[in-house]
Regions:
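Membrane-embedded transmembrane alpha-helical bundles that form the catalytic cores
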Residues: 1-394
Length: 394
């Protein structure tokens, strides 16, 4: 984890935040751009560090020239989207996709033995796609090359989000707060909160919840399997929200506020509310760029359900290259479809909130469903299936 290294704070965060505060408005984007480039190169494979920076710049310059000198056309938008997706597929999904055809890696002519993931590729790919689509739809201004590269290479959010929007980031970049004391106090507090979650909760539970295999499942007392699953749910929430806390706090040191990502999702009483409060920047991105373009809730019932399933198929694939992540995403899609069907049959009472016992039952069902689905997030499909057979059958 980059966020728990002294190098992150002493070599990058503190010096860059101070320089950004002292820089003129014209030079701030360059400070963020250059510090982000150095950060990326330092914490990734240095022989590939320049490749991604060049790709970022190339994609932006292409879209910039088109939007400046030519009337935007749909093929330009699709070209930008396609090249960005291919870039992600090449690095993240190549071995997984070719492995579906050639199960034996030794016989796979397309297998990339030394495959690696460029730092933050899943996050900055979604930011690329957002920019390409929103520029085409004129939902955001173009900005300068330095401002765009500062947006992409803003290193506090590069590793683990939150996923930013250009039109939200740009005004904050141009009008950085001069309230040093308040920003640094709140930023440092948020960073410390994240570190406590990471070391005091997530890492403690990691020793217990990680590396569960079929032999462990076979030996375990069945009720302990359920305890293990709920412990993993707490661990992954503490882990993910810790990254977000540190990223949000780090951005605050620059005087820039980025989107919140987690808002007590496990306290929500239905799966819809859970996703409105879990990884919120990702959920909003999926709604705006997958669900709504597919037709959203404007279509007939069956089409709406299909839109939900496709959206969460994308969510699963985004989280990881494996069939288990697809299953995990589809399980959440199915839960959302069932919730929507149920509300068509049993609408919420018009006279006020549901009774307490109903809310409690709904919360328990949601909490159980979310945690049971985690099995496919942390295990391959075969091991997760055996886990459930052992848990429910014996």
């Amino acid at each position: 984890m980059i966020f728990n290294s002294w190098d992150y704070y002493l070599l990058f965060l503190i010096p860059s935040a101070i320089l950004c505060r002292l820089a003129t408005p014209e030079r701030r984007p360059w400070v963020i751009f250059l510090s982000g480039g150095l950060f990326f190169t330092y914490f990734s494979y240095t022989q590939f560090g320049g490749v991604v920076g060049a790709a970022c710049l190339g994609i932006f310059l292409w879209e910039s020239l088109v939007s400046r000198f030519y009337k935007p056309a749909s093929w330009v938008c699709w070209f930008g989207v396609t090249q960005t997706v291919l870039f992600l597929v090449l690095f993240k999904y190549r071995n997984f996709l070719t492995g579906l055809v050639w199960r034996d890696a030794a016989r796979n002519p397309l297998y990339w033995k030394h495959a690696f993931l460029p730092l933050g590729i899943s996050f900055f790919t979604f930011e690329f796609l957002h920019y390409a689509v929103d520029r085409y739809k004129n939902r955001t201004e173009e900005g300068s090359v330095a401002e765009y590269m500062a947006f992409i290479l803003f290193f506090p959010t590069m590793v683990a989000g939150p996923i930013k929007r250009y039109q939200d980031f740009l005004p904050k970049l141009r009008a950085i707060s001069r309230e040093w004391v308040v920003d640094w106090q709140r930023g440092a507090t948020r960073i410390l909160t994240g570190l406590v979650k990471k070391f005091g909760v997530a890492d403690v539970l990691t020793a217990y919840t990680n590396h569960l295999n079929a032999a462990d499942i076979a030996r375990a007392w069945r009720p302990m399997l359920l305890v293990w699953l709920f412990a993993y749910g707490i661990k992954i929430y503490a882990d993910f929200s810790a990254y977000s806390d540190i990223a949000i706090g780090s951005a605050r040191l620059f005087g820039i506020r980025v989107p919140e990502n987690f808002d007590w999702p496990y306290l929500r009483t239905n799966i819809t509310e859970f996703w409105r409060h879990w990884h919120m920047s990702l959920t909003n991105w999926l709604i705006d760029y997958i669900y709504v373009p597919l037709g959203g809730s404007r279509r007939a019932g069956g089409r709406v359900y299909a839109n939900i399933l496709v959206t969460f198929l994308v969510s699963g694939i985004w989280h990881g290259a494996g069939v288990n992540f697809i299953v995990w995403g589809m399980l959440h899609g199915v839960m959302l479809v069932i919730r929507r069907m149920w509300r068509r049959v049993r609408p919420l009472p018009a006279g006020g909130p549901p009774p307490m016992w109903s809310q409690l039952g709904s919360w328990m069902l949601t909490y159980a469903g979310v945690n049971l689905a985690w099995a496919f997030f942390c295990m391959d499909v075969h091991t997760a299936s055996y886990f459930f057979r052992r848990l429910f059958v014996g």
